[in-house]
Amino acid sequence: MIIKKISNLVRKKRHLKLRKKIIGTNQKPRLNIFRSNKSFYIQLIDDEKRITLCSVHSKEVDSKGLNITTATKVGELIAQKALAQGIVNVVFDRGGFLYHGKIEALADASRRLGLKF
């Protein structure tokens, strides 16, 4: 239990370091990812106006569990919603998570459909 708390604290510190460097605008919003034990939450955020442009939750896709298949479907869905709003360029905010596995699959799927970051 204590190991989980420490790893979550390290992730939060990593995310704070990242957030100091990246800012989303209206032309290039921030693609923010949060992964819990059971689901993904992805948002396109305009930090200047402090609004969410669009969001996707892993419950919106028809797959159970938190696996690479779900991450791929969620990445495709956020790309479709962004392209429908005319957003092509985004700033990728991995939320302090390591760029590996599910996060990498989500990023690759959204790139494949046309998002550029």
Swiss-Prot record:
Which UniProt keywords are given for this protein, alphabetically ordered?
Ribonucleoprotein, Ribosomal protein, RNA-binding, rRNA-binding
Return the InterPro entries for the record. Ribosomal_uL18_bac-type (IPR004389), Ribosomal_uL18_bac/euk (IPR005484)
| GO MF annotations, alphabetized | 5S rRNA binding; structural constituent of ribosome
Recorded source organism is: Phytoplasma mali (strain AT)
Subunit text: Part of the 50S ribosomal subunit; part of the 5S rRNA/L5/L18/L25 subcomplex. Contacts the 5S and 23S rRNAs.
Q: Could you state one GO cellular component term attached to this entry?
A: ribosome
**Per its UniProt record, what HAMAP family does this chain match?**
Ribosomal_uL18_B
Q: What domain of life is recorded for the organism?
A: Bacteria
Q: What does this protein do?
A: This is one of the proteins that bind and probably mediate the attachment of the 5S RNA into the large ribosomal subunit, where it forms part of the central protuberance.
Name the Gene Ontology biological process terms. translation
Gene that this sequence comes from: rplR
- The reply on keyword Ribosomal protein is yes
Q: What protein name applies here?
A: Large ribosomal subunit protein uL18
Family membership: Belongs to the universal ribosomal protein uL18 family.
